[in-house]
Amino acid sequence: MNVLEAVFLGAVEGLTEFLPVSSTGHLTILEKLLGHDIDDPDITAFTAIIQVGAVFATLLYFRHDFRRLLAAWGRGVRDPAWREHPDYRFGWAVILGSIPIGLVGVAFKDQIETTLRSLWFVGGALILWSGVMGYADHVGTQKRHEEDVTWKDTLVIGIVQCMALIPGISRSGATMSAGLLRGLDRVAVTRLSFFLSIPALMAAAALQVLTKSDDIADGVGWPATIIATVVSFAVAYVAIAWLLKFIARHSYSVFIGYRLALGATVLFLVATGIVSAT
């Protein structure tokens, strides 16, 4: 992979990681169009590792929130009186909500990295989950806010987040849809989606580094991977700021329309043989 491709893919990762359009789906499509074998271990590892850039963008953007949550969590561990504090309960809720995707990701690791990366799955998932997003956006009451989030909310959202292991579903699209169906408002579910992303993405990247470091070195190359990660960080930071402002005033309709168009295009290209599915 050359530097220009790394910069391009890093920018796409940073832009799409937190938008409900599936960053992994986009990377899978683009890696295929750039001539890479999307089933190669080095390509699947590259796709997971560059998400770390988006994670660090989240940590930087929400640094004050994380500092507050960690302080409350630490006090709650030491002092039972703090255990009813909203920040303490929210911290535990995020931890609980992160467990399901870790368990499912490990259990189905081989299928996620091979079979599910087929463009048939990507295109179909983009279209099918658009219907779920549209339904959630339409029926969600949005009467509950971030301070109302409970461990039951994050557990349900965390279970639904497992669907995002299928490229094309979108981790943020899954968590936001589940949150809306739990009655949370758009800003609350968007912020919660950011918080839930950190354990999931860091664990996925760490697993790839530990198990496929040699594949990266021999294939894509660590220089290209590091460059893409840095670009992902910069673009993701801007995307986070934009999304929070956008979602406070608009529905998910623009993302749903985009997903439908992209999914239909992908399926057309594969069905006509213009692009192979794997």
Swiss-Prot record:
The EC number(s) this enzyme carries: 3.6.1.27
Taxonomic superkingdom: Bacteria
User: Keywords in UniProt for this one?
Assistant: Antibiotic resistance, Cell membrane, Cell shape, Cell wall biogenesis/degradation, Hydrolase, Membrane, Peptidoglycan synthesis, Transmembrane, Transmembrane helix
InterPro entries, per the entry: UppP
UniProt KW Membrane keyword: yes
| GO MF annotation terms | undecaprenyl-diphosphatase activity
Question: What Pfam family is a match, any one?
Answer: BacA
Catalytic reaction(s) noted: di-trans,octa-cis-undecaprenyl diphosphate + H2O = di-trans,octa-cis-undecaprenyl phosphate + phosphate + H(+)
This protein's GO CC annotations: plasma membrane
- Which family does the UniProt entry place this protein in? Belongs to the UppP family.
Q: What else is known?
A: Bacitracin is thought to be involved in the inhibition of peptidoglycan synthesis by sequestering undecaprenyl diphosphate, thereby reducing the pool of lipid carrier available.
Which HAMAP family has this protein been placed in? Undec_diphosphatase
Could you tell me which NCBIfam families the record lists for this protein? PRK00281.2-1 (NF001392), undec_PP_bacA (TIGR00753)
Its protein name is Undecaprenyl-diphosphatase 3
Q: List the gene name.
A: uppP3
